[in-house]
Curated annotation (Swiss-Prot):
Record keywords, A-Z: Cytoplasm, Methyltransferase, rRNA processing, S-adenosyl-L-methionine, Transferase
Any Gene Ontology CC annotation: cytoplasm
The gene coding this protein: rsmC
Record's protein name: Ribosomal RNA small subunit methyltransferase C
Keyword presence, rRNA processing: yes
């Protein structure tokens, strides 16, 4: 069980009424708290929770339409996302109890200071390198629309500026990361057809390809509901058409692809997690059509080339700069 869940269950008597658990991990916490519902923005966690606790877990970027008298927020990595979630929950909890739980190395002590605007916070417990905080919401705020927290910026590309819309919690929120910047310089001679932007984030790669290769069909895939929402906003801001889907890894992707583009993720919250990236590399051949191509950027220290060669039988380095490499392989 997640150590944060274990800290909550040390105070289980507090959580026996109608409860919403935001950012709930895919463990047995709902099994221990029968009147609780979960809200998650991670498609993989949603699939696991829904399989075990059907109808009690809700996926998306908005507070789910369920009744609750108290709420727990599992602190996310992003400060901007934490602020959005605290506001969204507190706006529904006038006079109710809001709890915040997180790891010390994830910044729980600093995040708990944001509870002061809502009432008088107090630390209830500290164990398993985690802390649990509580506040009675005396000053319920007005809910802020998610789009009001969007960061908008323009990327100057060869074929003109691309408008990017990023949301709290999305990778490299409000700016272009170095890996994607390098890959954007090496998008020439791409195969035309069905293109997948894997781990799409704010949709930079997918939108760029759709504009440059308008005859291609673009599908964008991410595990995070906020990334899915941001990618849709980026497409709309540039008057482009594309399909944006949520799913946990390459298994959720369509088949018969002409191209897979990616700056694959290797973090889950504050933890390193290579599983999604390694599955992409190992299973790419199952989703590419014959002659289809995979082109991705990754940190130079990651040993991805042997995995790509094992899956597709070939791999070459197209470019290397700023600690990143671009790999290209063909099925």
């Amino acid at each position: 069980m997640d150590p944060r869940s274990e800290v909550l269950l040390r105070q289980a008597d507090l959580f026996q009424g109608p409860l919403l658990i935001a950012g709930a991990p895919a463990d047995d916490l709902l099994g221990q708290l029968p009147k609780a519902n979960a809200w998650t923005w991670h498609a993989g966690d949603q699939a696991m929770l829904d399989a075990r606790f059907a109808g009690r877990s809700h996926y998306g970027v908005d507070v789910p339409p369920v009744a609750f008298e108290a709420a727990v927020l599992f602190l996310p990595k992003s400060r901007e996302l934490a602020a959005y979630l605290l506001n969204a929950l507190a706006s529904r909890l006038g006079g109710g109890e809001l709890y915040l739980v997180g790891e010390k190395r994830g910044g729980i002590e600093g995040a708990a200071k944001h509870l002061q605007a809502l009432g008088k916070p107090r630390k209830l417990d500290s164990a398993r390198h985690c802390q649990l905080w509580q506040v009675t919401v005396d000053n319920a705020p007005e809910a802020k629309p998610l789009e009001s927290l969007a960061e908008r910026f323009a990327l100057e590309l060869e074929d003109g500026p691309l408008q990017v819309v990023s949301l709290p919690g999305v990778f490299s929120h409000g700016r272009l990361d170095r890996g994607t910047a390098l890959l954007l310089k090496h998008l020439d001679n791409l195969p035309v057809g069905h293109v997948l932007d894997f781990g799409c984030g704010a949709g930079v790669l997918g939108a760029t390809v759709k504009r440059r290769y308008p005859q291609s069909r673009v599908t964008m895939l991410d595990v995070d509901a906020f990334a899915v929402a941001a990618s849709r906003l980026t497409l709309a801001a540039n008057k482009l058409e594309g399909e944006v889907i949520s799913g946990d890894g390459i298994d959720a992707a369509p088949g018969d692809l002409s191209l897979i583009l990616s700056n694959p993720p290797f973090h889950t919250g504050v933890h390193t997690n290579y599983q999604a990236s390694e599955n992409l590399l190992k299973k790419s051949g199952q989703h590419l059509r014959k002659g289809g191509e995979m082109r991705l950027v990754a940190n130079s220290f990651l040993r991805y080339q042997p995995l790509i060669e094992g899956a597709l039988g070939n791999c070459r380095t197209c470019a290397e700069a700023d600690g990143f490499r671009i790999y290209q392989a063909t099925r």
